[in-house]
Each structure stands twice: as C-alpha cells, then as structure tokens.
UniProtKB/Swiss-Prot annotation:
SUPFAM superfamilies: RibA-like. It catalyses: GTP + 4 H2O = 2,5-diamino-6-hydroxy-4-(5-phosphoribosylamino)-pyrimidine + formate + 2 phosphate + 3 H(+). Pathway: Cofactor biosynthesis; riboflavin biosynthesis; 5-amino-6-(D-ribitylamino)uracil from GTP: step 1/4. The active site is at D126, R128. GO terms for cellular component: cytosol. Binds 1 zinc ion per subunit. Pfam families: GTP_cyclohydro2. This is GTP cyclohydrolase-2. GO terms for molecular function: GTP binding; GTP cyclohydrolase II activity; zinc ion binding. Catalyzes the conversion of GTP to 2,5-diamino-6-ribosylamino-4(3H)-pyrimidinone 5'-phosphate (DARP), formate and pyrophosphate. Keywords: GTP-binding, Hydrolase, Metal-binding, Nucleotide-binding, Riboflavin biosynthesis, Zinc.
C-alpha cells in the first residue's frame, strides 16, 4: 500500500454533498483526494472517475483540453446516479508537473502536438501511475467499478492492480477550435476512445 488515509470531511458542491477523503503517499508526502457521493455498497459495482489534476482546465477553464468539462460531467453524473467516487489524481500534466506542462504548451504553440511536446521535454507521452488509485479503491473497500474514462491505459493499469472493471463508460467532450488537435492526438497517438 503506497498511501495512507489522513482525514475525511463533508464537501458541499452544486451537485450535492460529497465526502472528501484525503490521502498521503508514504514515500514523498504527496496528497491525493477522493470524493464519494452516497453509500458505497459492498459487491455492487460503483460509478467511478479517476480525474488527473489539471490546474489549467479545472481551475482556469482552459479550452486547450477536455479536463475541466470532464470533471464537471463526472461529478454531475455521479450525483445523478445517487452514488459514486471521483478520485482526483494529483499527477499534473500527465505527471510531468505544472511548469513542464506550461513548457509543453509553449511547444504546442509552436506547432508540436501534446505527445511530441512531452517527448521534446524528455518525457513519455503519459507518465502517470494509476496504481495509487487502486490503493484508494482498496482503502475504501471498493473492488468493482464502472469506470468513466476514454483511456484504455487507465483501464489496463487498474485491472493489473486488482480492480475489477465491469464497464467502461465513455466521457466525451465536444470538440472546439482550441481542443480539436489535442483530442485528435489523444485518439491517434495515445489510443483514447474519444469519438462515438
């Protein structure tokens, strides 16, 4: 187990009250959170979303990506179903960090795509480790999930970490003139299942 649970509290949102759980990585003290809505029922697959941190999309409403819209869609869907979990995965910029993400944005402004920009900076296309999320599911005694994702890598890593995914539910964001190239790159180079 790479994480320990630190605390939980009520988090009122526009979609209702969630419980917010705080976790800490044992090796480096990095924090992660999970938002739980409603009751977790043993042996019943729960709707789940792993949302990777994206300050630019989540807090500043950037149109370069689909992150902020996906966060809102996931919280709304979880609340409308009556229960679910959203893990806020603190691995900004596909785990290259905020400042490197800004450098990658600058390279994208010069014509590189999101994968090429990461590689130019010395990173792989996706540096994230979703095994931390499996630890959160295990700490909260969640064994079976219905996963809101377009990312087959996320599905594979969770299954390899012992989480049973009974259904993959797409979370599709409409293209706009700012994110169309980014979404196309995610589909073509990273295998994301973005189009109906």
């Amino acid at each position: 187990m790479q994480l320990i649970q630190i605390e939980k509290a009520i988090l009122p949102t526009p979609w209702g009250d969630f419980l917010i759980f705080g976790f800490e990585e044992k090796k480096n003290g990095k924090n992660h959170i999970a938002l739980v809505y409603g009751k977790i029922k043993k042996n019943i697959p729960i709707l789940a979303r792993i949302h990777s941190e994206c300050l630019t999309g989540d807090a500043f409403f950037s149109l370069r990506c689909d992150c902020g819209i996906q966060l809102e869609m996931a919280m709304s869907r979880i609340a409308s179903e009556g229960n679910g979990i959203l893990i806020y995965h603190r691995q900004e910029g596909r785990n290259i960090g905020l400042l490197n993400k800004i450098k990658a944005y600058s390279l994208q402004d010069k014509g590189l795509d999101t994968v090429e920009a990461n590689q130019k900076l010395g990173f792989s296309a996706d540096e994230r480790d979703f095994s931390l999320c499996a630890d959160i599911f295990n700490i909260l005694n969640i064994k079976k999930i219905r996963l809101l994702t377009n990312n087959p890598f996320k599905v594979d890593m969770l299954i390899a970490s012992g989480i049973e995914i009974v259904e993959r539910i797409p979370i599709i964001v409409e293209k706009n003139d700012k994110n169309a190239h980014y979404l196309k790159t995610k589909a073509e180079k990273m295998g994301h299942l973005l189009f109906k």
